């Protein structure tokens, strides 16, 4: 897409209706959904095997759902935003891991969960319009 810049433009603009990259973007999102489903299934099995609570994994399913919705309904359709929005609770997954996985056999999972939570919380900068206002893509 000519003139596109990841720093100041929305990622969804790559899949916007009528762009040359629309179908490539959609295929990428659908493939991402499929891969994330297999990833979630694997994590679910690991949790069951190690006796870990599955709530953090169930929250991860919001990502799969959101990416699929954003891919099937391209920007600027209303459903693009609506079906893409469940991923806003994705940050709850590492938070739930910190709460529910207190005693685990998986080394360093609490540290990794905390670091992941901190990084994911940076995504909420997108809701502060005056903070880095020219860098919407970077905040996203």
Regions found by a protein language model. Give the residues of each.
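Hydrophobic cores of alpha-helical transmembrane segments in multi-pass inner/ER membrane proteins
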Residues: 27-39, 89-99
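Interfacial helix-start motif at the membrane-water boundary
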Residues: 14-34
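Alpha-helical transmembrane segments of multi-pass membrane proteins
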Residues: 1-5
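Interfacial helix-loop-helix junctions of multi-pass membrane proteins
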Residues: 6-7, 73-83, 130-140
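Membrane-interface helix-boundary motifs at transmembrane edges
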Residues: 42-55, 100-112
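Small-polar-interrupted transmembrane alpha-helices in polytopic inner-membrane proteins
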Residues: 57-71, 118-122
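Membrane-proximal helix-loop-helix units in multi-pass membrane proteins
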Residues: 63-105
């Amino acid at each position: 897409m000519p003139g596109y810049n990841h720093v100041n433009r929305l990622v969804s603009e790559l899949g916007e209706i009528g762009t040359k990259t629309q179908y490539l973007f959609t295929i990428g999102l659908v493939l991402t959904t499929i891969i994330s489903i297999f990833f979630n299934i694997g994590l679910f099995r690991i949790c069951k095997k190690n006796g870990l609570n599955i709530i953090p994994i169930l929250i991860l399913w919001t990502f799969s759902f959101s990416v699929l919705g954003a891919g099937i309904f391209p920007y600027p359709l209303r459903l693009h935003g609506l079906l893409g929005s469940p991923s806003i609770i994705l940050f709850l997954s590492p938070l739930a891991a910190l709460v529910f996985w207190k005693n685990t056999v998986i080394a360093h999972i609490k540290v990794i969960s905390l670091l992941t939570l901190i990084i994911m919380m940076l995504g909420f900068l997108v809701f502060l319009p005056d903070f880095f206002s020219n860098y919407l893509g970077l905040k996203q």
